[in-house]
Amino acid sequence: MNGIKYAVFTDKSIRLLGKNQYTFNVESGSTRTEIKHWVELFFDVKVIAMNSHRLPVKGRRVRPIMGHTMHYRRMIITLQPGYSIPPLRKKRT
C-alpha cells in the first residue's frame, strides 16, 4: 500500500464512520483508480464512491526561500452497505 499514508481521525472523519465512509491521507501523485484498487485489494471491501481534496499547504521558510510542507491529499471513501474496515471501526462505550 504505497499510495495510502494513514487513516485520519478528526471529528468529521469519526462522524462519517457512521455513514460507512472512511478517511485516508494519500500521496498526491496517486490516482483515484489506484487508490480504489489498493483499498479494495488490501481491505477486501467494495468501494462505491470516492471524494478527494487537497488540504491547504503550510508554509515553511528556510532563510530567503519560501516552500511548503504538505505533499498529500485527503480521500473520503464510501463503501457498499455490509462492508466495513474492521481496524477503523470502534464501538462507543
Swiss-Prot record:
Protein species of origin: Phaseolus angularis
SUPFAM superfamilies (UniProt xref): Ribosomal proteins S24e, L23 and L15e (SSF54189)
Q: Which GO terms describe its biological process?
A: translation
Record's keyword terms, sorted: Chloroplast, Plastid, Ribonucleoprotein, Ribosomal protein, RNA-binding, rRNA-binding
Signal sequence, renumbered to the chain: none
Tagged with keyword Iron: no
Recorded hits in InterPro entries, A to Z, give: Nucleotide-bd_a/b_plait_sf (IPR012677), Ribosomal_uL23-like (IPR013025), Ribosomal_uL23/eL15/eS24_sf (IPR012678), Ribosomal_uL23_CS (IPR001014)
Q: Which gene encodes it?
A: rpl23-A
Cite the record's note on assembly: Part of the 50S ribosomal subunit.
Q: Which GO terms describe its cellular component?
A: chloroplast; ribonucleoprotein complex; ribosome
Q: What does this protein do?
A: Binds to 23S rRNA.
Coiled-coil spans are none
Please identify the protein, giving its name as recorded: Large ribosomal subunit protein uL23cz/uL23cy
Q: Which GO terms describe its molecular function?
A: mRNA binding; rRNA binding; structural constituent of ribosome
